[in-house]
């Protein structure tokens, strides 16, 4: 699949080949769902904790005798029905993370890349560039040539360029991701995807294996 490559000024300069095995496969919505669920689950801290009836402070003495008072029978002030009692079936610290099969993860990445590449207006390939100044305004001028700021914008880099990342820190709804640190959830919810040539070449090379 051929796509136009633009300069950082927004001018068409050449074309690039997007490998059909990466950017034009049949989209597997199930694998995308499972990958996003896995990524979000792995981010959960899992520190929520409640006290059971055996852990809360208070006497374990029976408040009143079982029979003869006309009141409901109660065994302890710490029972979950009473205010200040323990919590029944409440959350405890746990690990929510789990491992997703590699084949499912690879299929999810290729599916979400194919989904984004299917919309030529919201997926742009641009020549490699540097921002030596590291200034936000310099990066913002480049982005305006390719995307509106009405939704999430993701820029894919071929390497971990700290100056470009520094320039994008103050831009709202912008994520700058290097090729080796992509997440399906970021690509899926991006309204505009801008990929540098180097990122496309590395994606072609990595996911064709």
UniProtKB/Swiss-Prot annotation:
Q: Does the keyword Ribosomal protein apply?
A: yes
Q: Which Pfam families match?
A: Ribosomal_L4
Q: Which residues form a coiled coil?
A: none
Domain of life of the native organism: Bacteria
Question: What are the UniProt keywords, alphabetically?
Answer: Ribonucleoprotein, Ribosomal protein, RNA-binding, rRNA-binding
- Biological process (GO) annotations? translation
**Does the UniProt entry include the keyword Iron?**
no
Q: Where is this region: Disordered?
A: 46-71
Q: Which InterPro entries match?
A: Ribosomal_uL4, Ribosomal_uL4-like, Ribosomal_uL4_dom_sf
Any single GO molecular-function term of the entry would be: rRNA binding
Q: Sorted alphabetically, which HAMAP family does this protein's record hold? A: Ribosomal_uL4_B
Q: What does this protein do?
A: One of the primary rRNA binding proteins, this protein initially binds near the 5'-end of the 23S rRNA. It is important during the early stages of 50S assembly. It makes multiple contacts with different domains of the 23S rRNA in the assembled 50S subunit and ribosome. Forms part of the polypeptide exit tunnel.
User: Which PANTHER family does this one have?
Assistant: 50S RIBOSOMAL PROTEIN L4 (PTHR10746), LARGE RIBOSOMAL SUBUNIT PROTEIN UL4M (PTHR10746:SF6)
- Give the record's family classification: Belongs to the universal ribosomal protein uL4 family.
Q: What is this protein called?
A: Large ribosomal subunit protein uL4
**Organism, as annotated:** Borreliella afzelii (strain PKo)
Q: Which gene encodes it?
A: rplD
């Amino acid at each position: 699949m051929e796509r136009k490559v633009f300069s950082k000024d927004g001018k068409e300069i050449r074309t690039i080949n997007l490998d059909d095995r990466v950017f034009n496969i049949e989209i597997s919505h199930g694998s995308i769902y499972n990958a996003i669920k896995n990524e979000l689950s792995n981010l959960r801290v899992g520190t929520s904790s409640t006290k059971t009836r055996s852990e809360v402070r208070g006497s374990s003495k029976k408040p009143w005798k079982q029979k003869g008072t006309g009141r409901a029978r109660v065994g302890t002030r710490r029972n979950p029905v009473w205010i200040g009692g323990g919590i029944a079936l409440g959350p405890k610290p746990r690990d929510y993370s789990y491992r997703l099969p590699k084949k499912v993860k690879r299929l999810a990445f290729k599916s979400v890349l194919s989904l984004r590449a299917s919309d030529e207006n919201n997926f742009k390939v641009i020549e490699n560039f540097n921002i030596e100044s590291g200034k936000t305004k310099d990066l913002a001028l480049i982005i305006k040539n390719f995307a509106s700021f009405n939704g999430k914008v993701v820029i894919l880099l071929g390497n971990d360029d700290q100056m470009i990342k520094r320039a994008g820190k103050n831009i709202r709804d912008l994520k700058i991701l290097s090729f080796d640190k992509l997440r399906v959830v970021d690509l899926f919810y991006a309204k505009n995807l801008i990929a540098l040539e180097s990122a496309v070449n590395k994606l072609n090379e990595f996911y064709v294996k």
